[in-house]
Amino acid sequence: MSSAIEALFEERRRFPPSPEFASQANATGELYEQAERDYAAFWAGWARKLEWSKPFTETLEWNEPFARWFGDGELNVAVNCLDRHVRCGKGEKIAYYFEGEPGDRRTLTYRELLEDVNRFANGLRKLGIGKGDRVAIYMPMIPELPVAMLACARIGAAHSVIFGGFSPESIVDRVNDASCVALITADFGWRRGNKVPLKRNCDIAMEQTPTIAHCIVARRVGDDVFMHETRDIWWSELVAGESTECEPEAMNAEALLFLLYTSGTTAKPKGIKHTAAGYLTQAAMTHELVFDLKAAHDIYWCTADIGWVTGHSYIVYGPLANGASSVLYEGTPDFPDKDRFWEIVERYGVTILYTAPTAIRTFMKWGTEYPAKHDLSSLRLLGTVGEPINPEAWIWYREWIGANTTPVVDTWWQTETGGIMIAPLPGVTTLLPGSATRPLPGIGVDIVNDRGESVPLGGGGYVVLTHPWPGMLRGIWGDDERYVQTYWSKVPHRYFAGDGARRDADGNYWFMGRIDDVMNVSGHRISTTEIESALVDHPRVAEAAACGKLDEMTGQAVYAFVSLKGGLGGTPEFADELRDHVASKLGKFTRPKYVTFTQELPKTRSGKIMRRLLRDIAEGRTLGDTTTLADSSIVHELAERAKAEVAQEE
């Protein structure tokens, strides 16, 4: 860490809640006051909304940096997501509207989901899998994925979901780190009309995973795959004849619910540990309040992949704990055409939509004719997740998807936090385009400088969390020392989030991206997010990414990669126009030295811009691992263009 990050961009537009929305909102301003008085008691109140087989009497045990929440209580997560809803007469309520990429559709009621989970849980027990085991899951976005997760939770096994876009090597790393005893997969998945060979990837991986005794395979596509005689079993055969009842395992509140690995592109992946009760409490509370969920009639859709934490918390555990009806979509936003998302919103009458800024910027680039084809009037609340959203994308989202009326909740959180940490409470919070606004009730946040001192309002710096929260990670699997070093060693007694932000005069948080997405230009520390927001503010720019390039004169120079609306190419004259535009918005020292135009920015399959690769391209370095890219051909083309751009400027 060096000096605090300079905050340059000021957004003045404000959207207070409408009286109509506020009058029916789940949240009230009193929640902040309750949490301020006693945050542990506040969280205990939310935990008591869950069903406990043994109620807790101890709320928080804090031995920094290790927390135990509700530690003497017992519950079962699957019971809280399924059984209790069926018991109270909601068994016929739809849990999931499933839409496959090829257009096949299924609905699953809470009763059907419970029966499927119980059959599969019984099948797992028959294989000898049970309490304390770890089970890897590598599946497409089909209903069998949440079924597998909940079946593990029912019998007390911890799941480790591996994103279906990862390579066999990534499967090996994750399976071996946790000594998983079983691997659950599918024959294939669908992606843009192509068959993704999931089972084949698992076969390659299992040559190097000695702890895997069983591989369970769901049929998604139906094509032939290799089946090992003693190891592999079809899902359908495993559950055939199994009972639709399964006794749930009573689990301690602090029992491991799942592992989720953060990306291992530069180091060994970190197995983030989340435990049953605290995680479920925060997932359910945040889902109810941040999305203003009315479970009786809302149709909720989080477009993430379950392979990422957003899918765990806001497709599976939060919505099911709250008895919500959700859309589960297998495919991409542009297959078979660029209006697929809006077709789905219209078909199911989606009322709450939660997606990523990258997707929104892509929709902007494609143009408004695609959402305009469909009736989106069912939507009443929009959310964003995954990275900071620039104000223009926020405004576009509200205007073209939300009919200029819906609240837009920009949410900040991490794999490590388990649930949303900073976000508006719709009906309470005045919304600011580009700001996640305030920490949620019960969450302690501060911004500090490089000496660990709190930065006054109006200043920028490093985001830290000031006290424990229920959904927090309980460590890194098998590596307590790495947990302490990564998150607790940089600022005394504070969780170091690794993100930069500024806090305005009203206490609202404006995120500026990861700290490694900060440039030092002539002694000024500038967030790449602010540069990108200024670029996207230009009416012809659809998407932009910025990074620093080493520079003899200024330490670092700003390098901008720009994608234009309508897929148009850029000219040297327009590059100069963009340089002037950024300088006028943020100051002359922020003027990009290099501007490279591209049809597409390199992104992971989850839609995040691969900034590490852009830094490599800018510096002319050998490109690192590209296996997580959605389209690796983009990178090599971009590297050639960048080489020419640098040669021209120098």
Predicted regions and their residues:
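Conserved pre-ATP/AMP-binding loop-to-beta segment of ANL
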Residues: E92-I94, C215-V217, H228-Y261, K268, ...
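ATP-dependent adenylate-forming carboxylate-activation enzymes
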Residues: M139, S160-N176, F188-L198, G278, ...
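Conserved AMP-binding/adenylation subdomain of ANL enzymes
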Residues: L280-I299, V309-I352, K365-W366
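Gly/Ser/Thr-rich phosphate-binding loop
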Residues: Y317, A321-A324, T351-T355, M364-L431, ...
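AMP-binding/adenylate-forming catalytic core of the ANL superfamily
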Residues: I162-D187, C202, D334, E346, ...
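Conserved AMP-binding/adenylate-forming core of the ANL superfamily
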Residues: E33, A78-V79, Y96-L150, S167-V172, ...
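Structural core segment of the AMP-binding/adenylate-forming
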Residues: N122, L150, R154-E237, G349, ...
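Conserved ATP/PPi-binding loop(s) of AMP-dependent carboxylate-activating enzymes
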Residues: R438-G442, E453-Y487, I526, T622-L623
